């Protein structure tokens, strides 16, 4: 298996190398051919530019010289003789300046054309040679093995996902027919309350309801006509629900009355007395009776003042915002007085519960704050007592240390310290006396030499005083350390020598 894998890998590597070599060779050949063509074009442009420059120099030279005939005869004689001269015939008159210039330009143009044709032929010949060489190389190459695995692969199906064609439009037609049937059921509907104050009229043409752009219907309200949206009326609960839009128009349908199930603390309310009697006329003329009640969420709907003439003339609803007022007559979608009272009682109970909850929260927060203050004060008092106790213990220890030092002091050591202090005091007195004498002698010193000598002596004296002070400080610290060490040793000996029974000792107090 390993040998097969090795052979496959070698073949794939050889194939990749061949493919890369072929690509590199083709790219190099294309680059060489492009470079050769560009070089030939550049050479052509250079030759043309040189010829034009020569023509310009010749023209300037002819203009500068005063004798144009002689200069033209000297410069252009060989070319003109080659092109214009006839054997056995001598020129009758000298050629004018304009004729000589024209003949010279024509000869130049012809020479340029000849050069361009020769260069074009050379380029064509070079390209043909390259093509022949490439064909020979392709013929000499080995035929490509179609069985070997290729690096570049293409799918059999370039398109992975094909979008199916559009389905038949019968489904859309059925959908629109169902909607028309549904509107046909509601084509002629009269909705009114028990008192006959409000009517809703739906017009029907040819037994079917055509979809309007706005889906509006004509509504009679308090003797006024309005164009309202069908969706708004359906959402407010005017229209009865339709069980099946695809059912036949001749089948009578009856809608059972709904009772308002809004309850307070789990009890049902009374059924509302206001009902809607709706009668629909099908295309054959058979009446269909619907009995419906107002929806559960019945709210007071303000009626807007609408100009009836404009609505009749234009056939569209007036969308201008106008002052709204509540109808004095109790409509089918208004709350009854009992329901209003119950709703008011519910709102009062909710507000009362909300106020009690807020009051309870405020009291709890105050209680928590009071407890936190008490706990903080107790902690602070405890910390103060601890600090005072620590200070008292530290002061007692310091007093004991001072007493132990005085009791355990060596008399010889004390005498030495006293003697040293007296010696230091005497030294200080002598130094002060010397300073006083020097100050008195300064008045008698004359010149700069005496002043400099006095200043140097003063500096030397200051240095010595400073060194003496440092030495005294060192000696004092050394003595204090020795005393502390000796006192600790004595305490240790006393503690070890003293026979102590087993007893409880409170180290913190």
From Swiss-Prot:
Q: What does this protein do?
A: Microtubule-binding protein that localizes to the microtubular manchette of elongating spermatids.
Q: Name one GO cellular component term.
A: cytoplasm
Region of interest called Disordered, as start-end residue ranges on this chain: 46-120, 241-367
GO molecular function terms here? microtubule binding
Similarity comment text for this entry: Belongs to the CCDC181 family.
Organism, as annotated = Homo sapiens (Human)
Q: Where in the cell is it found?
A: Cytoplasm, Cytoskeleton; Cell projection, Cilium, Flagellum
Query: Where does it primarily localize?
Result: cytoplasm
> Which residues does UniProt call coiled coil?
335-375
Q: Give me the gene this protein comes from.
A: CCDC181
Bias (Polar residues) ranges:
243-266, 300-334
Q: Where is the composition biased (Basic and acidic residues)?
A: 46-82, 338-367
Q: How does it assemble?
A: Homodimer. Interacts with HOOK1. Interacts with HOOK2. Interacts with HOOK3.
Report which superkingdom the organism of origin falls in.
Eukaryota
Protein name, entry field:
Coiled-coil domain-containing protein 181
Provide the organism lineage as a comma list: Eukaryota, Metazoa, Chordata, Craniata, Vertebrata
Per UniProt, the keywords (alphabetical) are: Cell projection, Cilium, Coiled coil, Cytoplasm, Cytoskeleton, Flagellum, Microtubule
